[in-house]
Amino acid sequence: MEMKAVCVLKGQGPVEGTIHFVQKGSGPVVVSGTITGLTEGEHGFHVHQFEDXTQGCTSAGPHFNPLSKKHGGPKDQERHVGDLGNVTAGKDGVAIVSIEDSLIALSGDYSIIGRTMVVHEKRDDLGKGDNEESTQTGNAGSRLACGVIGIAQ
């Protein structure tokens, strides 16, 4: 059975986008979409714990981490479930998102439905930095835009 989800990203500034998620059975989740209004370069891209948007993207809480692991890159064994690495924006400020991830899911224990997708100000160092913040957030900086992930047709 195929499941689909969608997330509309919005923030205080010009950054916005739409992200689509598709999962067939227990296979990997295919994440695709477009984010506009970014500065050129890499930006951290994570699923955060909560659906709470009462204080903008800040109230989305930490990265989705049901396994209580340290922050890492999407290909690492040691990573939060919500660690999807970086998206890269060109000179035009547009990032084309194309990710396939086997840890997130659209149902079950690692379901991202009802959680918040966040795009960050800076590059995610994938937990390879030399400070404590690297093992928690990847030093990705402030939250530029976010949106709740919901079930789609």
From Swiss-Prot:
Keywords: Acetylation, Antioxidant, Copper, Cytoplasm, Disulfide bond, Lipoprotein, Metal-binding, Nucleus, Oxidoreductase, Palmitate, Phosphoprotein, Zinc. Cu cation binds at H46, H48, H63, H120. Binds 1 copper ion per subunit. The gene is SOD1. A lipid is attached at C7 (S-palmitoyl cysteine). The modification Phosphoserine is found at S98, S102, S107. Disulfide bonds join C57-C146. This is Superoxide dismutase [Cu-Zn]. The modification N6-acetyllysine is found at K122. The keyword rRNA-binding does not apply.
